[in-house]
């Protein structure tokens, strides 16, 4: 088999082991063993629940949500959902929508499924991963091979068809994982699906908090870490909470780059005008925390090149 050429637009992230917190709190052996047993049960049960509910969409969504929440409990991640949208804003995404979020870890899929079961666009090799691959196949993940640009239009068409038919599809336009403290620009390609289907876009702020309520990078899946090592490390962590916040939906408009900028402004807390002028792909707010408020630009400066 020919190895695909890595193109100039291949998504990349500078995040690595150095982004992980030093000596985070962990659970003991007994709790870890219980987590593993419960997680294996949840991993085995969730695909079954999805299949059982196939003829009945509402039942399928409810069972999928229950399975995902059980899995989150097994992993040891609590869940908080924030939603200040008006009834009118909620109604705009009730019958099909494209959901947009930043990408931190494989746990993002579990967290967002626990809130609202959806179809996910994810890296193609996820289907072949141990354990998670089975879950991905059951949830009918739309695979995308980031090394093969010619496949992108087909994926966009599939997403547009799903939301046009009333489904909810989640995309991670950063196109790769970041640590959550630093993050990348939202790439506009997949957002074309919202424009083609004339569907509203739902931005979602997703972050992970430690037991003190501060944002943590403990769950990030970055650098050279394998999926097995990441699962083992995250299962040992204690005091984690995922926070999911729904912001006001964005109209699709006619320009996917403008839509990407609007969504980026919506899902980032660090600066109202974050996406309003050209910048490099990575921003780390901790680099600039020592700046005086009076001197700080409403658009955070760039910390490093991607």
Predicted regions and their residues:
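Soluble, non-transmembrane catalytic domains of enzymes that act on hydrophobic metabolites at membranes
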Residues: 1-21, 80-85, 107-109, 136, ...
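A transmembrane-helix-recognition feature enriched in membrane-embedded lipid enzymes
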Residues: 18-81, 134-139
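Glycine-rich active-site/cofactor-binding loop and its immediate structural neighborhood
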Residues: 93-104, 108-115
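Generic beta-sheet signal
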Residues: 95-101, 141, 167-173
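Membrane-embedded segments
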Residues: 107-158, 167
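A cross-family acyltransferase "interaction/gating" segment
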Residues: 132-133, 179-262, 273-286
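Polar-ligand-bearing catalytic/cofactor-coordination segments
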Residues: 143-145, 247-253, 265-269, 306
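Soluble extracytoplasmic domains of inner/organellar membrane proteins
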Residues: 159-169, 175-191
